[in-house]
């Protein structure tokens, strides 16, 4: 522990002890003395209440094993991890072991049946007092309380936007398409279309979006029937109305790849219109040389979102509406640079120098 003593040659000698990190020499802990006991044994008995962290048993070795809602430390100390009641018990699956556990309620016995799920609190207790229930329902975290005004404002704006969208959908199917849907089913039809659009926007395909929208409304009707105590006949009637409404909407209404409501287009018609679009674009070619060419291409893509998926439309736009056209001499590459050209500098690896390429405005799609 001490590597040595250093003394001075002067009259007033100072002893300096140098301590190093060497391991202490082995020896008896008690040095042959009768030391105090370690206070082993039970600290909590059968039926006593415990809090998390309270020690139940101190022991040398595992005389008792940890059961439910307790843990064992490195010195074999058993302590509670949940508030409850101490139970000493035997487990028929381990006949030679004695267990200590914590029951979550006083009427609960251990061990529980072996194949039953564990009883857990999930950090919650049941409230019986109406005042406490109301207080808990209205309670907000600090973060929610500080941002309450912003949250309420955003919620109000979302609800207003949702209702506006539902009104627009109803006007579209009643005024433009003139579907035979009675006004009493306005909310049902609008809600279905809103859910249908949300499913498409979240990445579902057509059938999945339709199924999820209808399933949601079916479950809401069943909950409403349970809440308002409808009889079976009334619930069946409402579900039948939902089936009729959704079937009519599915064959009358669709959405573009920008999630705008449009009249229904069959898969065969979509393929036909796609082939026609590709044919017309091929006739125009990829080299757009004038403003009229640009206008013609944009006109072709005007309704493309109705029958193309977003990926298909992006692919065709990249193919036929290149932001920078390929270099063609005397078409979009000038002989010399001037005020009307855009100079592009490119390193030429063969000649080890920078080439200066003057491009005309016809080389850039946005400048046409």
UniProtKB/Swiss-Prot annotation:
The keyword Transit peptide applies. This is Large ribosomal subunit protein bL27m. It comes from Candida glabrata (strain ATCC 2001 / BCRC 20586 / JCM 3761 / NBRC 0622 / NRRL Y-65 / CBS 138) (Yeast). Its main location: mitochondrion. Component of the large subunit of mitochondrial ribosome. It is found in: Mitochondrion. Belongs to the bacterial ribosomal protein bL27 family. Residues 31-44 have a biased composition (Basic and acidic residues). It comes from the Eukaryota. Keywords: Mitochondrion, Ribonucleoprotein, Ribosomal protein, Transit peptide. InterPro entries: Ribosomal_bL27, Ribosomal_bL27_CS, Ribosomal_bL27m_C. The lineage of its organism: Eukaryota, Fungi, Dikarya, Ascomycota, Saccharomycotina.
